[in-house]
Structures are given as structure tokens and as C-alpha cells.
């Protein structure tokens, strides 16, 4: 019976550690994704400003 308690405790502990590591990794991925989105938005805003500066008939060569 003591062996079963230790085994169960070990399984639960390792599961908890695994879940916390996955949550941490997920948070990092979310942070990276939001940073990429912000950079993309900034880049798109810059492109829109460039388009406003050019006359509509202007074609780059």
C-alpha cells in the first residue's frame, strides 16, 4: 500500500510539473506572437504612410 501511495504521489507531482512547464512555454509563445503582430502592424502603418505620400498615378519602376 505504501508503494502505491508513493507511486501515485510521484505521478501527480510529475504531472503538475509538466503542466506548469507547458503553461510557461505557452505564455512565451503568446508573447512572441503578440510581438510579431505589433511589428507587423507597425510595418503596415509605415507602408500606408508611404502610399499617402505618393500621388495615385505614380508607379514605381
Curated annotation (Swiss-Prot):
The keyword Transport does not apply. GO terms for cellular component: extracellular region. Expressed by the skin glands. Residues 1-22 form the signal peptide. Residues 25-61 are annotated as: Disordered. Keywords: Amphibian defense peptide, Hydroxylation, Secreted, Signal. GO terms for biological process: defense response. Residues 23-53 form a propeptide. The modification 4-hydroxyproline is found at residue 56. InterPro entries: Frog_antimicrobial_propeptide. Residues 36-55 have a biased composition (Basic and acidic residues). Transmembrane segments: none annotated. It is found in: Secreted. Belongs to the frog skin active peptide (FSAP) family. Tryptophillin subfamily. This is Tryptophyllin-T1. It comes from Pithecopus azureus (Orange-legged monkey tree frog). The lineage of its organism: Eukaryota, Metazoa, Chordata, Craniata, Vertebrata.
Amino acid at each position: 500500500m505504501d508503494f502505491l501511495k508513493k507511486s501515485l504521489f510521484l505521478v501527480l507531482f510529475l504531472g503538475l510539473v509538466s503542466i506548469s512547464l507547458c503553461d510557461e512555454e505557452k505564455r512565451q509563445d503568446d508573447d512572441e506572437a503578440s510581438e510579431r503582430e505589433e511589428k507587423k502592424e507597425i510595418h503596415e502603418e509605415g507602408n500606408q504612410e508611404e502610399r499617402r505620400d505618393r500621388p495615385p498615378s505614380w508607379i514605381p519602376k
